[in-house]
């Protein structure tokens, strides 16, 4: 239920040993999730208004980097605000305030209007978060007011305690130039091959895996996390900075909006008509580790 702290209200969800806190004012993100007192997500830094590197948030109406913050749509060029060097990153909802539509003991629904001064087509994004004793279910939907391209994803920041293992069942990833995906694919190999569930260790990855099969699996010394996604298979970004790591299920590859129309659709972008919707779901479920960690 709503709880107070310095600054805007947060929402606390509780289901048995599982506890999650949502922060509507900071991107509608899951600010924390703990099971049996064990925290899974990176917590907020002191400057939570400007930091992207914590919690778990929805990326919409596009995920990941968009080269030069620009794409073509309906015969016009849409120029977005550049938020990551020369590029626009992670959509328009991660750093804005979401409205709280409903909240119960273990579930909440939030929504946000896409700002027309940055996204001329308008529209809105809705998300529902449901908690159980051993799972966190995340659902999101983009609704179009008029014809528009759409994609979404989630960006969880996981704690890296105990040198966890990560299994991603994908045989290819998207080639990048200057950290921006190009649309070309390469076979996984070396440190990029996560199919056997290796330890993250010193791997420094920032890759969009293609057609990843559900679920991805994280194994800490005492806990296993299964990241299931619907629909599947999907593009799945793995990012491994020092001290944390991210496993990001997406409905389209990063930079897909910048591709030509046919390639854009092949990369997963949905072209919505007025009143149409794009939805997706992620189910994070935990269980005791089997001993392999």
What spans do the regions from the language model cover?
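Short, Gly/Pro- and small/polar-rich lid/capping loops
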Residues: 1-16
């Amino acid at each position: 239920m709503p709880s107070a702290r310095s600054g805007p209200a947060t929402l606390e969800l509780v289901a048995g040993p599982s506890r999650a806190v949502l922060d509507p004012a900071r991107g509608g993100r899951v600010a924390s999730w703990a099971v049996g007192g064990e925290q899974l997500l990176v917590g907020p830094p002191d400057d939570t208004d400007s930091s992207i590197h914590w919690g778990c948030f929805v990326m919409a109406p596009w995920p990941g980097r968009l080269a030069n913050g620009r794409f073509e749509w309906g015969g016009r060029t849409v120029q977005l605000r550049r938020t990551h060097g020369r590029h626009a990153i992670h959509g328009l909802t991660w750093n804005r305030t979401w409205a709280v539509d409903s909240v119960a003991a273990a579930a909440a629904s939030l929504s946000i209007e896409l700002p027309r001064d940055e996204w001329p087509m308008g529209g809105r994004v809705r998300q529902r978060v449901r908690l159980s004793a051993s799972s966190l279910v995340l659902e999101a939907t983009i609704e179009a007011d008029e014809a528009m391209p759409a994609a979404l994803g989630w960006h969880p920041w996981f704690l890296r305690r105990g040198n966890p293992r990560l299994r991603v069942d994908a045989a290819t990833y998207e080639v990048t130039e200057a950290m921006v995906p190009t649309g070309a694919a390469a076979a996984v190999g070396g440190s990029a091959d996560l199919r056997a569930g290796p330890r993250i260790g010193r791997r420094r990855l920032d890759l969009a895996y293609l057609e990843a099969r559900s679920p991805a699996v994280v194994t800490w010394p005492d806990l296993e996390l299964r990241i299931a996604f619907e629909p599947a298979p999907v593009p799945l970004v793995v990012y491994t900075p020092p001290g944390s790591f991210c496993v990001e299920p997406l409905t389209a590859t990063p930079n897909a909006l910048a591709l030509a129309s046919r390639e854009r659709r092949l990369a997963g972008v949905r072209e919505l008509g007025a009143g149409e919707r794009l939805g997706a779901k992620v189910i994070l479920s935990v269980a005791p580790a089997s001993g392999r960690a």
